[in-house]
Amino acid sequence: MKNCGWVFALMLLLTICSTTPSVAQKEKTVAEHAAGAFEVKVEAQGEADKAEGSTLGRYSLDKQYHGDLEGTAKGTMLTAGTEVKGSAGYVAMERVAGTLKGRSGSFVLQHTATMTQGEPHLSITVVPDSGSGQLVGLTGKMNIIITAGKHSYEFDYTLPTAQ
């Protein structure tokens, strides 16, 4: 039991953090929806790491957003492909800079995706407290739609009301 002190400290920290409202939580927020198109350039960063059963890759992302979100994004994506057709995964971080429905600043999106034998699962969320400028306090989730090779986004988000 003498090594349980760190467990208690961690539980105490989690309890304090979960009950202490952040600055963004104290302010009134408004739910919004944004949509538009984007172009993306994906470029391999080095050679793929191939081994029995899987291939790992690293890529740079360069995006141009249009519509309710006008701006650019740069990021890094890590991928894993398998020998099973339609099964793979990726994680990515991208820093978006631009104007979201008239409010300028930047924020970071975190992507987590898997595909199991052709069945995709994708989660794209705003990294907490990553907003800057007029986008401080931004939270939200983005969805990507690909139709006939064209990319578009749907972005449900909240922001503190403008002062």
Regions found by a protein language model. Name each.
Residues 1-8:
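Bacterial N-terminal signal peptides that target proteins for export
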